[in-house]
């Protein structure tokens, strides 16, 4: 499993904090950020890498998280969540099988961002009754 991470200019500093944290937790992290990229391009780059392997997960950081979330949900087969707390990050993996989260650097601080990332990457899909919902989401794209 690789964690694919990216950020626009507004999210770059927090992205580096999250990236360093995940590397310290022994996760393979692939940073697709390119200087000056808009959140749309960053989100598309993260999603492309996430979709290369079923077990890959993605994190996109900009100022508020909403823009990358809107982009991610337009991509076929991508289930994404905009999160600003640890519980939602963990639960979106368990119940929705989300493969990407977005967050805003002007919404969450460094400590919370680390905990969000940790909850997301350590979350496991529960399957079962939740698969019906995931199938519905996948039919929409």
Curated annotation (Swiss-Prot):
SS bond partners: none
GO term, biological process aspect, one: pentose-phosphate shunt, non-oxidative branch
The protein's name: Galactose-6-phosphate isomerase subunit LacA 1
Primary gene name: lacA1
Family affiliation: Belongs to the LacAB/RpiB family.
Organism: Streptococcus agalactiae serotype III (strain NEM316)
EC number of this enzyme: 5.3.1.26
Subunit-structure text: Heteromultimeric protein consisting of LacA and LacB.
Keyword Isomerase recorded: yes
SUPFAM superfamilies in the record: Ribose/Galactose isomerase RpiB/AlsB
GO molecular-function terms, A-Z: galactose-6-phosphate isomerase activity; ribose-5-phosphate isomerase activity
Entry keyword annotation includes Protease: no
């Amino acid at each position: 499993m690789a964690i694919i991470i990216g950020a626009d200019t507004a999210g770059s500093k927090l992205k580096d904090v999250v990236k360093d944290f995940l590397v310290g937790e022994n996760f393979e992290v692939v940073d697709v950020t390119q200087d000056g990229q808009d959140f749309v391009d960053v989100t598309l780059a993260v999603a492309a890498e996430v979709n290369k392997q079923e077990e890959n997960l993605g994190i996109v950081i900009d100022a508020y998280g909403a823009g990358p979330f809107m982009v991610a949900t337009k991509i076929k087969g991508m289930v994404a969540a905009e999160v600003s707390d640890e519980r939602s990050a963990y639960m979106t993996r368990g119940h929705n099988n989300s493969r990407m989260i977005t967050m805003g650097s002007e919404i969450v601080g460094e400590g919370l961002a680390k905990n969000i990332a940790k909850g997301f990457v350590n979350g496991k899909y529960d399957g079962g009754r939740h698969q019906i919902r995931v199938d519905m989401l996948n039919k929409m794209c």
